[in-house]
């Protein structure tokens, strides 16, 4: 059985692009608070691994989990709690480059295969009106860094370097490779 350990509709849609349909969806419930002094990339990898290990599965089940983190320097910008925090994130990202890290973990029994992908995103300089318009769209909800590149925020991002699907939430080339390494052979 193939289990997607994520409640993200974007991850489910991305998997479908490579012909992978989960048999079940089981979002794990873990503490996502960064450790004191933890840097963004190790944090993101730890989250994906902990999520994969937290999903209840049988020994021959294939479990896929991922975590996406927006990093501005050493600072981790998670999912904003409210519109005020989302606006603050956009203000921080305005006119700057930042990293989007997506870590993936595939687990079968006690074995875990891991990979992370780092992409660079440049957000244009945003006016207060542009920030407010995006906040009003509600598209920031549930998204690391307070924006989703696949929605209205695409108009705010003139340049990326790296994996577009990684920025959305699941780097497909790397995910396909990990699933293959774990012995997953596709939909049955």
Curated annotation (Swiss-Prot):
One Pfam family it belongs to: Maf
Classification via Gene3D superfamilies: 3.90.950.10
Enzyme superclass (EC): hydrolase
EC number from the UniProt entry: 3.6.1.9
Cofactors (names): a divalent metal cation
Catalytic activity annotation: dTTP + H2O = dTMP + diphosphate + H(+); UTP + H2O = UMP + diphosphate + H(+)
GO cellular component, one term: cytoplasm
Active site (catalytic residues): 67
UniProt subcellular location: Cytoplasm
GO BP terms in the entry: nucleotide metabolic process
Molecular function terms from GO: dTTP diphosphatase activity; UTP diphosphatase activity
Keyword field contains Lipid biosynthesis: no
Function according to Swiss-Prot or TrEMBL: Nucleoside triphosphate pyrophosphatase that hydrolyzes dTTP and UTP. May have a dual role in cell division arrest and in preventing the incorporation of modified nucleotides into cellular nucleic acids.
Alphabetical list of PANTHER family matching this protein: BIFUNCTIONAL DTTP/UTP PYROPHOSPHATASE/METHYLTRANSFERASE PROTEIN-RELATED (PTHR43213), BIFUNCTIONAL DTTP_UTP PYROPHOSPHATASE_METHYLTRANSFERASE PROTEIN-RELATED (PTHR43213:SF5)
Record family assignment: Belongs to the Maf family. YhdE subfamily.
Protein name: dTTP/UTP pyrophosphatase
Organism whose genome encodes this protein: Roseobacter denitrificans (strain ATCC 33942 / OCh 114)
